């Protein structure tokens, strides 16, 4: 499909064309060289789920993402070390959203999960003076920036508090992707994420099989603890095989059987006859 660089007024006003807005948009890829996302740019794009953009966009006007209730993934083309408008975007999205940084060939190098949060107001004075309350660790996660650069250490530090407030699935999302990409991941942060994964291995197994994503499955099977032991032990792999069979996911079953045979098989003891 070829799109012309320039459209005349007759093209724009054709009656058989539909305006590209609202719930017609599900995924948008913004080109390199863009400098600004204008006011109300994606207003009422209620089915927009994925937005890919260059990390060097420098400005985002207010309410650009109003009513984008299904936006769950931002893909930043560039390095997490780049200065970006990400904080401005996140400040306009209070629902759960993931951010993935990818290089030019599309390969991901880091991913973060920003939990949902909500705002409430308490009246504390007779002259309509209100106190703003932020509920949820998602707000704190969105403040993990310094000079427009995302600060991983600050982001990782919210996890211990988030355990008491956020759902198991969302916490597994945060922990799992931090371990997979391990971008600027300290030893202490890695330990806390590993501990959570080990204690919630069964649920993580269910989520991975449900997604039917061979890449995610392979990443999980490759995870090791500090003693170089696989996180996926015999019991976990056996449970996942049962789930894959139940879900009729043959590719996942093949990967699991191969991993079990190559890494978890107990060597047969020699038998001596006297």
Where are these regions (language model features)?
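Structural signature of tandem-repeat unit edges
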Residues: 1-36, 46-59, 69-180, 188, ...
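Surface-exposed repetitive/solenoidal architectures
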Residues: 8, 185-190, 212, 270-274
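Short low-complexity, flexible loop/linker segments enriched in glycine and/or proline
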Residues: 66-67, 88-91, 246, 251
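Hydrophobic/aromatic side-chain positions at a characteristic register within alpha-helices
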Residues: 208-212, 245-248
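Charge-dense, extended regions
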Residues: 219-221, 242-274
